[in-house]
Amino acid sequence: MFKIGNFTLNSRLLLGTGKFDNEEIQTQAIAAAETEVLTFAVRRMNLYDKDLPNPLAKVDLSKFITFPNTAGAKTAKEAVRIAEIANHAGVCDMIKVEVIGDDETLLPDPLETYEACKVLLEKGYTVCPYISNDVVLAKRLEELGVHAIMPLASPIGTGRGINNPLNLRYIIERVNVPVIVDAGIGSPKDACHAMELGADGILLNTAISSAADPVKMAEAMNKGISAGRLSYEAGRIPVKYTAQASSPTEGIGFL
């Protein structure tokens, strides 16, 4: 169990809702993931026009914490406007601040992200910024007052896993708010690794929705995240450079 602002979460898997082939697979994958939090791009939801398609039409949103994001924003001003659209439509006031600074790599813009977070915090939102694995930026955002830090593992949709585990560990060790690893996770192994490093949770979309069997992958990710967290809490053995027998040698007679 952990908290983001006033929201208490039991599941450490936060699930994105895009890219599923159809609504049936989406619904089954959500169930298999056992998630409590569904995230979505506000621009995809058509919040004010009920005649347009709703990608979550078949999902009972009353059973979940809805977690809108500002995908599509390229400036702080755009991110704030998107967040306010979601809030005025009655969607959860916890917002993932996503401000993209480069169209090719889809890496977040640190300056615009910081400014958007500052404004949204002043307006009373629960703010969770998506950032690169910049340790100093993570600390500055925590000092600003954000409620969680969401560093990428690797660029969005690449499935490359954790490109820089050292920086991710530095972020986890240095901030005192939840760290949700977001973007680049490709397999349950990657998710488990992030959790073993001490992450509080994982936000996933492409790794599940684009898998050959999204429902099975959702289950696998759920178990990988649970295993990684349990391993972190248990404490792994230290890495050594010399062999050490697992059987004791004391008290063994000569043969």
Curated annotation (Swiss-Prot):
Primary site of residence: cytoplasm
Record localization: Cytoplasm
Binding positions for 1-deoxy-D-xylulose 5-phosphate per the UniProt entry: G157, A183, G184, N205, T206
Top-level taxon of the source organism: Bacteria
Top-level class of the enzyme under EC nomenclature: transferase
Keyword Iron appears in the UniProt entry: no
GO cellular component assignments: cytoplasm
Pathway: Cofactor biosynthesis; thiamine diphosphate biosynthesis
GO terms, biological process: thiamine diphosphate biosynthetic process
Cytoplasm keyword on record: yes
Pfam families registered for this protein in UniProt: ThiG
Assembly with partners or alone: Homotetramer. Forms heterodimers with either ThiH or ThiS.
Family recorded in the similarity comment: Belongs to the ThiG family.
Protein name (record): Thiazole synthase
Source organism phylogeny: Bacteria, Bacillati, Bacillota, Bacilli, Bacillales
